């Protein structure tokens, strides 16, 4: 009887052990059962170790990055504090320089004013001195011009005697 005819007409099982390759399947399944867990287990174990190593490396990098970020934040806040301190110091310094410049300008203006007053005073003093000198010269000239008319011989002798007495007293 031909069993393959029955198989074409529907579902059927072939129970002939040598025709169905059940032995081959059994050997393959047994081999897979026996050797595959060790082979695949080693591959999966290596893969698992690689993944765990990569995870640990990623965690270490994350930790380092977090620490670097914290340090950078501290450095930034320190730099901001230093910048604000420098700004405050520069404002104080510029204010003191401005005040010093104003003080020097006021002192210079006072000195210039005093110099102008001094120049004006000395000029006035020179003018007064010149006027006095001219007045004295004019008075002496006038006195000398009027003296010959007013002095006679006795008055002149009395004047000379009086001048000599004044010199002896001193």
Curated annotation (Swiss-Prot):
Record has Membrane as a keyword: yes
Keyword Transcription regulation: no
Coiled-coil portions: none
Disulfides per UniProt: none
Any one Pfam family match given in the protein's UniProt record, by short name: ATP-synt_B
GO MF annotation list: proton-transporting ATP synthase activity, rotational mechanism
Keyword vocabulary terms for this entry: ATP synthesis, CF(0), Hydrogen ion transport, Ion transport, Membrane, Thylakoid, Transmembrane, Transmembrane helix, Transport
Transmembrane segments: 22-41
Region (Disordered) residue spans: 72-98
Subcellular location: Cellular thylakoid membrane
A GO CC annotation given for this chain: plasma membrane-derived thylakoid membrane
Topology with respect to the bilayer: Single-pass membrane protein
Superkingdom in the source lineage: Bacteria
Family: Belongs to the ATPase B chain family.
Function as written in the Swiss-Prot or TrEMBL entry: F(1)F(0) ATP synthase produces ATP from ADP in the presence of a proton or sodium gradient. F-type ATPases consist of two structural domains, F(1) containing the extramembraneous catalytic core and F(0) containing the membrane proton channel, linked together by a central stalk and a peripheral stalk. During catalysis, ATP synthesis in the catalytic domain of F(1) is coupled via a rotary mechanism of the central stalk subunits to proton translocation. Component of the F(0) channel, it forms part of the peripheral stalk, linking F(1) to F(0).
Oligomeric and partner information: F-type ATPases have 2 components, F(1) - the catalytic core - and F(0) - the membrane proton channel. F(1) has five subunits: alpha(3), beta(3), gamma(1), delta(1), epsilon(1). F(0) has four main subunits: a(1), b(1), b'(1) and c(10-14). The alpha and beta chains form an alternating ring which encloses part of the gamma chain. F(1) is attached to F(0) by a central stalk formed by the gamma and epsilon chains, while a peripheral stalk is formed by the delta, b and b' chains.
NCBIfam families: PRK07352.1
Protein's name in the database: ATP synthase subunit b
Organism encoding this protein: Prochlorococcus marinus (strain MIT 9301)
């Amino acid at each position: 009887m031909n069993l393959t005819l029955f198989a074409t007409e529907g579902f059927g099982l072939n129970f002939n052990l040598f025709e169905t390759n059940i032995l081959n399947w059994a050997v393959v399944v047994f081999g897979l059962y026996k050797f595959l867990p060790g082979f695949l287990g080693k591959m999966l174990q290596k893969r698992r170790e690689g993944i765990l190593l990569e995870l640990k490396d990623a965690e270490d990098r994350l930790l380092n990055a977090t620490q670097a970020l914290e340090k950078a934040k501290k450095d930034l806040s320190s730099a901001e504090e230093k910048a604000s301190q420098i700004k405050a110091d520069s404002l104080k310094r510029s204010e003191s320089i401005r005040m010093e410049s104003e003080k020097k300008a006021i002192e210079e203006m006072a000195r210039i004013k005093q110099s102008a007053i001094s120049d004006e005073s000395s000029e006035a003093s020179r003018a007064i001195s010149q006027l006095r000198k001219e007045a004295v010269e004019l008075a002496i000239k006038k006195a000398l011009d009027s003296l010959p008319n007013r002095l006679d011989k006795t008055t002149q002798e009395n004047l000379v005697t009086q001048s000599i007495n004044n010199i002896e007293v001193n």
